[in-house]
Amino acid sequence: MIDLHMHTVYSDGDKTVEEILKLCEEKHLEYISITDHNNCMQYKDEAFNKNIFSGKVIKGVELQGSVLNKCIEILAYDYNIDILSEWINKYFSEEKLRERRNNQKVRFLEICDKNGLKYDESKIIYPKKVTAFIERSIYDEIIRYEENREKLGEYAKHFGLFYRKCLTNIESPFYMNYTIDYPTYEEIVDSIHMAGGKAFLAHPFEYKFNNTLEFIDEIRKIRELDGIECYHPSAEEDNRINILKEYANKNNLYISGGSDYHGSPKPDIEIGSGKGSLQIHKDIIEKWHRD
């Protein structure tokens, strides 16, 4: 089995690289990729020198971008780490992340004010890591109040749902325009290819679009993808994995997959198995990865 999508303390996960490698070894995974958001620092971690994990590691990173007024993520694999890191630093350096985080806080609170949501700004805790989402901290503050939870309804259940259906949904009164924060989809794909890597659309059903396959068709007209992440917890139900695999095969796209493990931020997700039924065989990478 393999798992090509997981996060550590280098982005918004809560496990160190060493802890992740130990978990992957315990699960007897054959291939893994640690795909932290918008940086490749995880691969410079000293844990890789400790012979903790006996399987093989594919370099990966998850890059945030915008396309058609929507926020998406692109998974890059098998890239030249120096070349891609140089490009990433233009958009996601520590200085830029701090500036962006401050701007996003102001914009999110303006949205809260406009929608009559109660909050105490002094209770909003800045994450220690600049790679973590300030929006999650603000969300944790607003759902402390019962009147806010009543207004948000089902979107008060967890941040991921609020992020996908409200903050990044142009039709929502809580929409926050992330297109000014992130590189475009085509810039990301071009940069991955310049670094010799392959670009996969991450978790298509995670975005909760009305017509996921039509959306993939549209962005492929802008820039062709190398592949799609067909195996993901968001696709574990309603035959979605097979729907994506069928689309990928029909359109000559490669297939990838992973649990999107974060640790306690996503407590229902386990490495290697997602929500429980995710099983990803290594044969899916035979067409696009060579050791």
Predicted features by range, described:
Residues 66-96, 139, 143-173, 273-290:
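Active-site gating loops and adjacent loop-to-helix segments of metal-dependent hydrolytic enzymes
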Residues 26, 48-52, 194, 221, ...:
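Secondary-structure boundary motif
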Residues 198-207, 225-235:
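Active-site core of metal-dependent hydrolases
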Residues 124-130, 162-179:
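Surface-exposed cleft-lining segments at the edges of enzyme active sites
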Residues 18-25, 186, 190, 213-221, ...:
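Amphipathic, non-transmembrane alpha-helical secondary structure
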Residues 171-218:
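Conserved, well-ordered alpha-helix/loop/beta-strand core segments that scaffold catalytic motifs
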Residues 216-231, 269-291:
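Structural recognition of alpha->loop->beta junctions
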Residues 1-144, 227-251, 256-268:
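A metal-dependent hydrolase metal-coordination microenvironment
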